[in-house]
């Protein structure tokens, strides 16, 4: 290859490498490295599209109960393992009709198309998420408070309103003596 051809090819090779690197970084930024779920940014774009397409969407906000205690008692590796298992259980529940994400820390989010028996589905989610986690020969207690919002019941279908309503429902669930129960609130 002569020097003139090399001089022409080098910038193209540089741009191709740079584009590949940016594509990889963008994909990585949209996936949580610990759980593999979508990050807030990756989840939000898909959730907004889902709300526009599916009037029957349900937004869920989930928070692990007493997660700090689990971390302090059993160690951060055990806490990370509990987060990964929770993410797997949530993703399995969402299946093909929903999208799960991790907002950060011990908070998760999901959007799903409403099934005719959604209350039963929320109960099955609660049961699945509140199962102990087997870690290093121990059974770690895991419980999750779940808040939900039926988008069709909002005056204006928006993701921000649905998340705010699901957040209120989640804290109402945390405030109950039993916790661990799904709550649905709508304005």
Region spans (language model):
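A short glycine-centered flexible hinge/capping loop motif at secondary-structure junctions
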Residues: 71-79, 104-105
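Short, conserved catalytic or interaction motifs in soluble domains
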Residues: 72, 113, 175
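Nucleotide second-messenger and two-component phosphorelay signaling modules
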Residues: 29, 48-58, 62, 73, ...
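Catalytic-core segments of nucleotide cyclases and related cyclic-nucleotide turnover enzymes
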Residues: 149-187
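GGDEF/GGEEF active-site signature
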Residues: 87-150
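Conserved nucleotide-binding and Mg2+-coordinating catalytic segments in signaling enzymes
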Residues: 27-45, 62-75, 84
């Amino acid at each position: 290859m002569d020097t003139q051809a090399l001089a022409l090819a080098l910038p193209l090779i540089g741009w191709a490498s740079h584009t590949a690197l940016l594509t990889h970084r963008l994909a990585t930024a949209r996936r949580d490295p610990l759980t593999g779920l979508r990050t807030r940014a990756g989840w939000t774009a898909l959730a907004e599209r889902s709300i526009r397409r599916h009037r029957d969407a349900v937004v869920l906000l989930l928070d692990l109960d007493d997660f700090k205690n689990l971390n302090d008692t059993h160690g951060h590796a055990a806490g990370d393992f509990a987060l990964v298992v929770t993410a797997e259980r949530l993703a399995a529940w969402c299946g093909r009709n929903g999208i799960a994400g991790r907002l950060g820390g011990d908070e998760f989010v999901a959007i799903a198309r409403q099934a005719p028996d959604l209350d039963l589905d929320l109960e099955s989610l609660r049961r699945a998420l509140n199962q102990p986690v087997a870690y290093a020969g121990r059974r770690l207690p895991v419980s999750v408070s779940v808040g939900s919002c039926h988008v069709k019941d909002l005056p204006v279908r928006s993701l921000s309103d649905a998340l705010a309503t699901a957040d209120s429902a989640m804290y109402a669930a945390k405030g109950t003596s039993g916790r661990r129960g799904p709550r649905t609130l709508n304005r």
